[in-house]
Amino acid sequence: MCPVPARDSTGSRVLDRWGEFEYALRCALARERADRLRWDTPVEVRQCPVAQESVARAARVAVSLDDPLEAGVFFERRALFLCRGV
């Protein structure tokens, strides 16, 4: 359940920001899944900052969807909005 640890710099600002965004999204999804399943959230996930409220909100919506395919489609539709700061 724990997401991939934060990455070292790639040398590319765009890739570094994308990596930060992806890590924050994974942490937000892990938190929401743990809450929904009433599991204890791992320390690594609790300590991960989710800087963008839009990322946390998208994770809440995706986890609330019962169909994983529907959640994937939701993320595809929201990808441009979620990534606009990257």
Swiss-Prot record:
What is the protein's given name? Uncharacterized protein TP_0425
What organism is recorded for this protein? Answer: Treponema pallidum (strain Nichols)
Higher taxonomy: Bacteria, Pseudomonadati, Spirochaetota, Spirochaetia, Spirochaetales
